[in-house]
Design a protein with these regions (language model features):
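Active-site helical microenvironments for divalent-metal-assisted chemistry
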Residues: 1-178
């Protein structure tokens, strides 16, 4: 793997902040901002991409009435949910599942972010099955779909993407295949 200067600096920064007592939720937000704040990190509507994970984490937070470990994991994963998938484009370097582990995020958060990340071998049905079987990933995907299909964002969606999101809703929320 080529030298990853920015990624390695980010890992060290997060490790140092964690050592000084920063919470996972704050650290997840810092990582998301670092990865999604470059000049390439603009969504299809011309809005800075960081606003998407901010909204997704807010939706996750609104789903809970009392603090729990599930909420904490889902909130952190919501901030991080596109970091692995989009880091090469937005950050200029890959951020991997192993990098998130090195930063100290717990296994449930790291696993959920990994499950939510599409790779080059992405097969939709397998992707949805993996998410459906992970409580944290499913909550984050619900919040992600809620944001992606909101009137604020959906005006910039093409028909293929709208159809794909409907399939995701059907499978993950309504438990219907097809």
């Amino acid at each position: 793997m080529p030298f990853r200067d920015k990624t390695n600096r980010l890992i060290v920064e997060i490790q140092n902040l964690r050592a000084s007592g920063a919470s996972d939720s704050i650290l997840a937000e810092i990582v998301a901002k670092a990865v999604h704040s470059g000049p390439e990190a603009i969504d299809k509507n011309g809005v800075p991409y960081i606003e998407h994970p901010r909204r997704v984490s807010s939706i996750v937070s609104a789903l809970f009435h009392e603090h729990s470990q599930l909420e904490a994991n889902a909130y952190s994963a919501a901030w991080l949910h596109d970091v692995i998938e989009d880091s090469q484009t937005h950050f200029g370097e890959a951020v991997t599942k192993d990098d998130l582990s090195l930063m100290g995020f717990n296994g449930k958060v790291v696993d959920a972010v990994h499950l939510l990340s599409k790779d080059a071998d992405y097969i939709e049905e397998e992707y949805l099955d993996r998410i459906a079987n992970d409580e944290v990933a499913k909550l984050v995907k619900f919040a992600d779909l809620t944001d992606n299909t909101s009137p604020l964002r959906s005006s910039g969606l093409n028909q293929d993407r709208r159809t794909r999101y409907q399939r995701y809703w059907n499978r993950l929320v309504f438990n219907r295949v097809k």
